[in-house]
Amino acid sequence: ESLKKTRDYKTFIDEMKKLMDKYWIWLYNEKHRSLHEKDTQHALCISNTESTDYTIIDLEFQVSTRKDCIYHYEPSSIPRHPGVDVYEKSPRFDIIAVRNSDRRLCVIELKNGLDALVGKSGIGDHADSFEGSIAKNPLAELMITKEMEKVVSDKKRLKLLSDDFYIDEKLPIEFIYAYAFKSEDENGKKAERDSFLREQEKACCMNYKVIYLNKGDFTLSDSNC
């Protein structure tokens, strides 16, 4: 508070950086998986900008609970929900990004390690969330696109994005998985990749692209699919 009063902004920023460093150390030391994912999300935001394959523009986006845009899916023919006629929820997506090559809006679900692939909030559950809210609901897709265009506009005004950055709203939103390897050696990474593919097959979501992230590298690259 005293730094703010003296308008010593350089010292204020330096002190804030120290506080943020302590915050990220605290996150690293937490055992809860979701906190590790939030830490990874932060690193992804820093690493994925207009100079890379994807520009991340938003995190933890929740689909509106308004009637026109809520998740509403009838998955009776989908093996991942046998016997269920109607399933409704308000899904939240980890990452919203724009692919810089074609300006397509992308929903990206981040997974850290093999334990994150199954059960509640597993890859099948995330596929359901996308299919029931965006892929099958034009109103939901339009709502999200318009909201992200507003985010882009605000970031341009704040000089966080270049003036010529845009979303191609004619292209349908794409769903992608991002998987962060726990292993560092090639044999371990191959085993994780094979396990991911098996879980994709079990969850009937083989049609979605997976971008793999090496340990300590948070750049989303289409060459790592």
What are the roles of these predicted feature ranges?
Residues E1-C225:
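Charged, terminal alpha-helix-loop-beta segments
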